[in-house]
Amino acid sequence: MTTEAVIVSTARTAVGKAYRGALNNTDGPTMAGHVMAEAVKRAGIAPGEVEDVVMGCAMQQGTMVMNVARKGAIRAGLPVTVAGTTIDRQCASGLQAIAVAARSVMLDGVEVAIGGGIESISLVQNDHMNKFHVVDDELMAMKPEMYMSMLETAEVVAERYKIGRDKQDEYSLECQRRVGAALQAGRFNDEIVPFTTRMAIVNKDTKEITYEQVTLAKDEGPRPETTAEGLAKIKPVFEGKTISAGNASQLSDGASACVIMSDRMAARKGLKPLGIFRGFVAAGVEPDEMGVGPVAAIPRLLKRHNLKIDDIDLWELNEAYAVQVIYCRDKLGIDPDKLNVNGGSIAIGHPYGMTGSRLTGHILIEGRRRRAKFGVVTMCIGGGMGAAGLFEIVH
């Protein structure tokens, strides 16, 4: 009899602004442990029932070094018998972690696992970041595009596929509007677990650092008051180009976790799953246009499950840049009314390793509200890849 992997709970921090937000001084194990503990609590299981923890993290150094999944599990109060591993597929790390955890349930007899993701851009992507030998000279000579910044690749997509600033800003404005409406309706409330932590505050004049206890209960990034005129006034990062702070995802901190178990265990416990993991694929594209990755991954995923674009009721795309969402949406023929229905990372933020897990939790909760059947979580990936995961929503 085939074992199905079902997601029975999800929990995430609110997304904090990198460097100047509430999570700018929160260490990785503590942040990861906070969402793991809450996901276990929401699932109504004993901590010792978890066999393995899989967490995605794109920048595994500093506070995230040496397996933050295992450290987070211990910090969550899970017993030492609970194992942990940390995965890096850049922006798809959180989704990859959920896929690995789900496959362990489907194929290896694991009854309960945690899949999720985490990123602290504040504590890792800073002046202390280890850049020793960050470039392999031989790879640079062979494929220099592997070392392009994500921003540079976004400009390539804009130029190559003729997607202008106006279209990008128009998309971003709609993103902020959708997030604003979702916030008013409380559509993120069931995902977020408030987090009391110690925030670092830097005095602009003296540079002195003080610390303040704060509670983060809502995403810090959204600006629903954004106007078209305001977006148009923001200067592009590169002079004469199209990508600006208004049409790109923000630098952010955050963590998310989902409890995944076998369908038989869920039935035995009388738990009603949020959804069923159905499949995951990754695909490579040219690294200089990494933003188009979903265009390679999604058809592969759908073909393996005998589905078409129109069979999918909800789509969540990581939204690294407006330009890549526009290209992927239009190239694949995705209905805009089914895509990022409550906004995305341009407004909320994009903690690289966390996002895939956040989107999974959100698509399952929103899918249930909308009586949807199938949802796809997808993203572009630094280095030139795309990933996509298929979930069936349970009502």
Predicted regions and their residues:
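Conserved catalytic cysteine-centered active-site region
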Residues: 57-111, 145-152, 225-250, 331-359, ...
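Conserved active-site "lid/cap" helical segment
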Residues: 1-58, 62-64, 68-72, 76, ...
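Flexible glycine-/small-residue-enriched beta->alpha junction loops
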Residues: 102, 106-160
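Condensing-enzyme catalytic core mediating Claisen C-C bond formation in acyl metabolism
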Residues: 1-28, 226-292, 296, 303, ...
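N-terminal extracellular/periplasmic Venus flytrap/periplasmic-binding protein-like
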Residues: 12-14, 25, 29-34, 167-268, ...
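Short, well-ordered amphipathic alpha-helical segments that serve as non-catalytic structural scaffolds
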Residues: 28-44, 68-72, 97, 150-157, ...
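Active-site pocket-lining segment
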Residues: 55, 152-155, 191-193, 197-201, ...
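Active-site-proximal alpha-helical scaffold in enzymes
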Residues: 87-118, 158-188, 257-264, 329, ...
